[in-house]
Regions:
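Class I S-adenosyl-L-methionine-dependent methyltransferase catalytic core
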Residues: 1-277
Length: 277
């Protein structure tokens, strides 16, 4: 990804491969109507990998980065950007690129919310965690997801070497109406408890074994496991039989594979309700 894509420091410079940039630009061209007067902004342009492609969409482009690695990029912290110089009621602004992710995607969310304050569309390379409803629910409700595509393995380079960061390219569009926010499910027939409270099973939350269920929880870490107590009155063995075949999309994240509480709730609710006698 760009020099500012995953981390904002001189030691971790990720660059998006040209072919990946081309695919992203093609999707923007296919799904977004860009008029001659519209403005395109790349908020974290890094080494300028998106410059050529964006200029192919429109001559009106602005490229910013807090630490530019290309002479065509203006030095600016996008989170402090003001669009007063572009205040034109007939001009729509389209924000395109690869924002910094930050810890648990905190910076990516900030970049999205900043862009959402003035943009008509937001087209970003994002961590795969943005395929999860819990992350999508953090995006302003007036924006609707109109397209997304998983990026292939090794879409980026660091110091000239292929680098695999699980990412997705998403296009969000501003509309007059708010999108439906997926409600947070509540556990049915079970509850999450702390390890010191009586519980029946542990569920591995993170790592290559994410999703694995175990009744032997003595040595299970509170940092990497959920602890669950069944409340439906059924035998523990019957409940385990109901949930043991659950499959999670554990690759929808950057870094170690992980399963969120909402994912566990949805999966357990469905499995336990399906097997009610």
């Amino acid at each position: 990804m760009n020099a500012t894509g995953l981390h904002r420091n001189a030691l971790d410079k990720f660059y998006t491969k040209p072919d990946i940039v081309r695919q992203c630009i093609e999707m923007v061209s296919q799904y977004i109507q860009i008029r001659p007067a519209d403005l395109l902004i790349e908020p974290s342009a890094g080494d300028g990998s998106f410059i050529q492609g964006m200029r192919g969409l429109s001559p009106n482009c602005a490229f910013y980065d807090i630490s530019p690695a290309n002479s065509e990029i203006t030095q600016l912290d996008f989170l402090e950007y003001t669009n007063s110089s572009h205040e034109n009621s007939s001009q729509k602004i389209h924000v395109i690129g690869n924002p910094p992710f930050g810890r648990q995607s905190s910076l990516a969310i900030k970049f999205i919310k900043k862009a959402a304050s003035f943009a008509q569309t937001i087209s970003f390379i994002l961590p795969k965690s943005f395929k999860k409803e819990s992350m999508r629910n953090k995006i302003p409700e007036i924006f609707h997801l109109i397209c997304e595509k998983d990026l292939p393995k090794n879409s980026f380079t660091i110091e000239g070497k292929d680098t695999d960061v699980p990412c997705v390219f998403q296009i969000w569009e501003r509309r007059e109406t708010k999108r439906d926010v997926i409600p947070t499910d509540t556990p049915s027939g079970f509850r999450f408890v702390v390890k010191t409270v009586t519980h029946d099973i542990s569920v591995r939350r993170v790592g290559v074994n994410a999703g694995v269920i175990d009744t032997n929880t003595i040595d299970k870490s509170i940092q990497s496991h959920y602890f669950i107590q069944f409340t439906n009155g059924k035998n523990i063995s019957d409940n385990i039989q109901s949930i043991q075949s659950i499959k999670y999309e554990t690759n929808n994240t950057v870094g170690p594979r992980s399963i969120s509480k909402p994912e566990v709730i949805r999966a357990f609710n469905e499995a336990l309700q399906t097997n009610i006698e």
